[in-house]
Amino acid sequence: MKCIIIYFSQSGNTKKMAYAAREGIHKAMGQCHIVPITRLDVRDLVGYDLIGVGSPCWLGVPFHVERLINTIPALSDKHAFTFCTHGAKGERFLPEMVRLLMKKGLTVIGTRDWYCSVNHPLIPKPYLTDGHPDEIDLQEAENFGREMVEISRRVYAGETNLIPEVPPMLPPRTLSRPQFKKKLNTKKCLYPECSLCMDHCRLKIIDLSQSPPVFPEECQPCYFCELICPTGAIEADYESDAELETGRAKTMFTEALEKAEAEGRFRRLTPVEKVGWDTPFYKFFRTHPRYVIPEDDRDE
């Protein structure tokens, strides 16, 4: 049996969980390939029997991840599992992803989600879930990977009763994120010496080689281009949107985490009194770049 994990990770949290799951699979079956979605040739997936898919939850499955899944060829009679990371409310991801994978003929044999820290310019810093993933989370991911191998083997052997029910879809979302309106200050931009925003645009809609540069005002949004720009050439007015997001964090996200904590699904590592309600991420990290991409993630 051959296994592969494909993943998207913006801040590195999902990557950590993916590699931990891979470790569990490796211990159970001796091998497991792992590939970020940016380096994936979807045609290669036909050679695998067990396929894992990991991603953060951005109000559900991120658009560019969904777009990639839709390009996967038919994979009937093969097994899949999926997992996500999130900062409070990840409940939409798994029902959506399971259905995307099932449309490709895959049998989904397991799902999992983890609370992780959040690097979002409008979210308070420190944040409610900071400190995750920790060693306990990583061990859980390793155990999850090992479990997926065991279940896959047994399902292939005929124990189809082990296949979990398809998680129900939630009602249409009423929550929407503020639309990220940005502009490029060409006087500050270092292109062609720097092309970080273009290289790491999730939707591949930035093209600085054109004259004038192709730089859409609105997008997914992931905010990554603004976070990684070394000179602050990507400009955005976060003030009013940060107030809205802080309000949601104080109410909706806090309530969701309190409920999860009471049910034993969330371990609080950052006390509420330590949360930076007055310092959204963009104020906590005032200088540019606000986030530095680790060297080994530069091609992801």
Language-model segments: which ranges?
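A mid-sequence, solvent-exposed acidic-amphipathic segment
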Residues: 165-191, 198-202
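Short acidic active-site motifs
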Residues: 39-41
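FMN-binding flavodoxin-like domain, especially the glycine-rich phosphate-binding loop
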Residues: 3, 13-16, 23-35, 47-179, ...
